[in-house]
């Protein structure tokens, strides 16, 4: 449930709608890229809950199926609702101007109905695991659709922080499907990692797309406060990730070393280019690093449990 950002600059020419298949349109409607990336964090939470509770994945294949399918449907549902709500500003932004709710491939009513149906279906699937998993997923969905998309996205620079709450719950959903008590510290470290990671990730993207956000009237931090303050905020949040691996000693020294090196690498990259290159180039490097960071970190959490 990680939150998706959207963009574009003014164009005087009439936009040409690209030819797309029905599958491509559906993928854009539910934002499959977001669903796929968040599914990794759901699975990681599920896997680590099994590991620390001494359970076998083979004995919990049914719960794994319900958890992955349920959480994926919920994420797809809230993304549909996001497309429905943002259909008035999506034409103003480059990455979203060809979404099916903008081009007319899907009518707004369909996007709304389809989003609600698969959202509810996702809750049903998760109900076959634990009520806590349903509760956490509801909190994530409510935060993304209501608190982020409907309320803060168009009004406050804190929209990034609010959206990061919803993006941080997927690993907790996975964990709660196995261990609804959520009393293991690593479960909450997963939440904190995802919450903190999203802020420099999306602020870097906002720097890259600053003109498009400005034209669309979305008050992202670089639009309102400029690049200098945004860069400082990116560095502050990146540094906040540094101590977290040391609260995850249960995963072993190998993981702690990998995570610490990833954190140091991100900080070093930010400091190295902080005043030595143009701001857009810096933001692109920070954004790309953040993507690789998250994938390597969460895959590492799974791999180290085999040794």
Swiss-Prot record:
What keywords would UniProt list here?
Answer: Cell membrane, Heme biosynthesis, Membrane, Transferase, Transmembrane, Transmembrane helix
A Gene Ontology molecular function term for this protein is: protoheme IX farnesyltransferase activity
- Location of this chain's protein in the cell: Cell membrane
Q: What is its EC number?
A: 2.5.1.141
Q: Where is it mostly found?
A: membrane
One Gene Ontology cellular component:
plasma membrane
Protein name in UniProt: Protoheme IX farnesyltransferase
